[in-house]
Regions:
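PLP-dependent aminotransferase-like
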Residues: 69-165
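PLP-dependent aminotransferase class I/II
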Residues: 11, 36-44, 48-54, 127-131, ...
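Conserved active-site segment immediately N-terminal to the catalytic lysine
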Residues: 156-190
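Short beta-strand-to-turn element immediately C-terminal to the catalytic PLP-Schiff-base lysine
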Residues: 180-181, 195-200
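Conserved N-terminal alpha-helix of the aminotransferase class I/II PLP-enzyme fold
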Residues: 14-62, 84, 304
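Phosphate-binding glycine-rich loop
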Residues: 36-78, 89-96, 102-104, 169
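Conserved N-terminal helix/loop that builds the PLP phosphate-binding region
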Residues: 1-20
Length: 411
């Protein structure tokens, strides 16, 4: 009977369903402004990453906006960007009058190709955003060496790389500063939030001043995020997914809806004005959630890492880029390259495993934006990288179904 309900969703919220309901109820009356509680979370988070300071904003894109703004880079300065990321980061870079410049990826670690990065940096390059995709650790020491030699400002985006390490040092602790997004389905999910980290006291002081100028938070925005989180949690609940969500996805597919992206397709049009919502304060309620989530993230990661390793062991002929340096990664997503992703996903779904591809944008391919260009490796990662379910709250039955399915695909 249990095995009947063991079909596996593509992902899951880290909060339990009970916690999601409790958070929704608590958020209705919880105090939103409490600087002491926010600072407590910031201190704990900074210590956890191995940084001296943390400053919290409503979104990662907001933190990146201010990190670039306080550097006072001249308009027209180039910012090296990952070809795969969220569109909001591109929007804030352009809003500051800066020019995006893309560098292609390394196929095995989803981060910048070292030689291509070195070749791309010139006298007009002022900053770089190093993004770690899917919980995979690149040779960050080499990338930092290249950037420091060329004297450019290094910002790490480790939103998908929490707890991944290089030389026993956590990603997010290498650059001049770093950013973590605590949005839905992240390892630490506080119903939104973008956290800025640095050891540079002067830089942090400037960021703190920007934080103080943010608009007051609005409870309705927080409630919407928590409700959306709860709905996703319900949809991926083991029983509800098997009875309702999985049949719904099949029906949508029949009627021509693209259901192969992780969280669906997103608007690709440039925004004319940055929304005020991006500049509202992070709340004390979110900080309280963060303090609680910090205590369990490592144990959750251990479960996911063990699952990822077993999947790769069970499928020796499937091309997993993350096999290289596998003990350094945390596998926020486990990525298999497929020659025909549509068929690969269809076969997995026929075996009860809901696989998908990334919902992140191929920024370098957005024709409506300046700087668009061909990035062959990034295009392969974006179009042919299939996510094998790899989340921490999988049941034993769900894990076994993934192992069995991947063995059949591999044979």
């Amino acid at each position: 009977m249990i095995y009947m309900f063991s079909k596996v969703p593509r992902g899951s919220i880290n909060h339990s369903l009970v916690d999601s309901v409790a958070y929704l109820l608590q958020s209705i009356t919880s105090k939103l402004k409490n600087d002491k509680k926010i600072f407590e979370f910031e201190e704990l988070f900074a210590q956890y990453i191995g940084r001296k300071y943390c400053v919290s904003f409503p979104f990662a894109r907001t933190a990146i906006y201010f990190a670039l703004k306080v550097k006072n880079l001249p308009k027209g300065t180039e910012v090296i960007m990952p070809p795969i990321s969220i569109k909001g980061i591109l929007d804030v870079v352009l809003s500051l009058g800066l020019i995006p410049k893309y560098v292609d990826l390394d196929l095995n670690n989803f981060c910048f190709d070292e030689q291509k990065l070195s070749n791309a940096i010139d006298e007009n390059t002022g900053a770089i955003i190093i993004t770690y995709l899917f919980g995979t650790a690149p040779n960050i020491e080499k990338l930092i060496e290249i950037c420091k030699r060329k004297k450019i400002f290094v910002l790490e985006d480790f939103s998908q790389g929490l707890n991944a390490t290089v030389s026993k040092k956590k990603l997010g602790s290498f650059g001049d500063c770093s950013i973590y997004s605590s949005s839905a389905i992240k390892q630490i999910d506080t119903f939104g939030g973008g956290h800025f980290f640095s050891d540079d006291k002067e830089l942090v002081s400037r960021m703190r001043k920007e934080q103080e100028q943010l608009y007051p938070s609005k409870r309705i925005f927080l409630l919407k995020k928590i409700l959306r989180n709860l709905m996703y949690n319900l949809a991926t609940n083991q029983i509800i997914f098997n009875i309702f969500t999985d049949p719904l996805l099949k029906a949508l597919k029949i009627f021509g809806t693209d259901v192969n992206r992780m969280t669906g397709n997103r608007d690709q049009q440039p925004i004319k004005v940055i929304p005020n919502e991006w500049f509202r304060s992070y709340t004390a309620f979110q900080a309280c959630v963060g303090i609680r989530e910090l205590k369990k993230v490592q144990s959750f990661d251990h479960k996911r890492i063990a699952h990822a390793h077993k999947v790769m062991e069970n499928a020796p002929s499937i091309d997993f880029g993350q096999r290289t340096n596998k003990d350094q990664h945390t596998y926020w997503q486990l990525v298999a390259y497929a020659k025909n992703p549509e068929t690969f996903i269809k076969n997995l779904r026929s075996l009860g495993v809901d696989a998908c591809t990334s919902s992140l944008e191929l920024l370098s391919g957005l024709k409506e934006y300046p700087g668009s260009t061909n990035m062959p490796v990034a295009e392969k990662v974006h179009s042919k990288g299939v996510f094998i379910p790899c989340f921490s709250r999988m049941s034993k039955w769900q894990k076994n179904r993934v192992y069995e399915a991947i063995e059949i695909i591999d044979s």
